[in-house]
């Protein structure tokens, strides 16, 4: 049974997951409908569709594993459920982080303007950057899956051994380290590009700060808003992996459901928060969402009149 604090946090986690799935579903559907209408898909549209779909899968895996750990922990130590969850998690989590890294790089190369020769070279070769990152993703999968299979097979072989109970936690840590090794590169690249874009926008805002004309004042507000979105993304992104680390530690520490659910809460903030950031930061997505909300409000008003 859960105490009141654990129950409240679990409700928060579930709400975050539902909002994240709804937000990503909306992003994916909007871009798919835009592609069906215009018969053309931009790089950003492709990345947003891939990011939304992969992140929906990641959220479901996080919630599934979280609920199993809270209510049915014995299921993770018996049968093949751990193996299935691990394989799906590695595939979807790597893919999700890869898509968000591509999105950050694309915005960075599109918006920022540095005189650095490396930056200028990258800006002229955006497609080459995507190909390189695709190669990194495939390499990450090729390195992770064989090693992960070996670890899981060793775990199965020793599971009936009584001494294995004490070693299982060490194997679990090794397993988690190996399966997440491939995404460290993408995480670092994503955070660096966000930080550099924030630096560029901050310098640009500071340069325009002395000019208070209408256009420049509006441009400054847009830049400040973009900086807030980027900082929010970085906070959510870091909290996501901090939460995952807490969840991993809870498998080797004495059982502490409150700490584990706290980790889940931090983990689910990113998919929920970033989907909202993407919707608010994209003009077309924002306008379409506002129209949808207005239509829902009108339908609700008409329904109230009919009841009366």
From Swiss-Prot:
Question: Which UniProt keywords are listed?
Answer: G-protein coupled receptor, Glycoprotein, Membrane, Receptor, Sensory transduction, Taste, Transducer, Transmembrane, Transmembrane helix
Q: Name one GO molecular function term.
A: G protein-coupled receptor activity
Spans within the Extracellular topological domain: 1-7, 65-87, 147-180, 254-258
Q: Which residues are glycosylated?
A: 80, 161, 175
The record's InterPro entries line, in alphabetical order, gives: TAS2R (IPR007960)
Q: Which residues lie on this side of the membrane: Cytoplasmic?
A: 29-43, 109-125, 202-232, 280-308
UniProt keyword annotation of Transmembrane present: yes
The alphabetized list of GO BP terms reads: detection of chemical stimulus involved in sensory perception of bitter taste
Subcellular compartments: Membrane
Topology relative to the lipid bilayer, per the entry, is: Multi-pass membrane protein
Q: Which cellular component, as a GO term, is one annotated location?
A: membrane
Where do transmembrane segments lie in this chain?
8-28, 44-64, 88-108, 126-146, 181-201, 233-253, 259-279
Q: Which domain of life is it from?
A: Eukaryota
Assigned protein family: Belongs to the G-protein coupled receptor T2R family.
User: Beyond the main fields, what else does the record say?
Assistant: Several bitter taste receptors with distinct ligand specificities are expressed in a single taste receptor cell.
Role played: Putative taste receptor which may play a role in the perception of bitterness.
- The protein, known as: Taste receptor type 2 member 107
Which organism's genome codes for this protein?
Answer: Mus musculus (Mouse)
